[in-house]
Amino acid sequence: MANTKSAIKAARKSLRLHDRNQGVKTRLKTLHKKLETAVKSGDAASSKAAAVAYTSAVDKAVKSGVVHRNVAARAKSHVAKIVFAK
């Protein structure tokens, strides 16, 4: 349990940020799954649209500090590799 007023506020902020971060990460996982299914279906248009949505979400996650920029670069590289390989 936090002892000082500032520690109580920091704990409250930590919980709030944790919830936000989990939401963003869950959205990224969902978009990645949609991308994988679009690629497996073989439809180029839906694959490209899913790739754009996923990369946009990854960039927004980097901007808000949820994901490190190197992790995002690796994820976007992976997307380009699987979408544009065909």
Swiss-Prot record:
- GO cellular component, as recorded: small ribosomal subunit
Q: Which Pfam families match?
A: Ribosomal_S20p (PF01649)
What InterPro entries has UniProt attached to this entry? Ribosomal_bS20 (IPR002583), Ribosomal_bS20_sf (IPR036510)
Q: Origin, by domain of life?
A: Bacteria
Keyword annotations for this protein?
Ribonucleoprotein, Ribosomal protein, RNA-binding, rRNA-binding
What GO molecular functions are on record for this protein?
small ribosomal subunit rRNA binding; structural constituent of ribosome
The segment annotated Disordered runs over 1-21
Q: Which GO terms describe its biological process?
A: translation
Briefly, what is this protein's role?
Answer: Binds directly to 16S ribosomal RNA.
Stated family = Belongs to the bacterial ribosomal protein bS20 family.
What's this protein's name?
Answer: Small ribosomal subunit protein bS20
What is the gene name?
A: rpsT
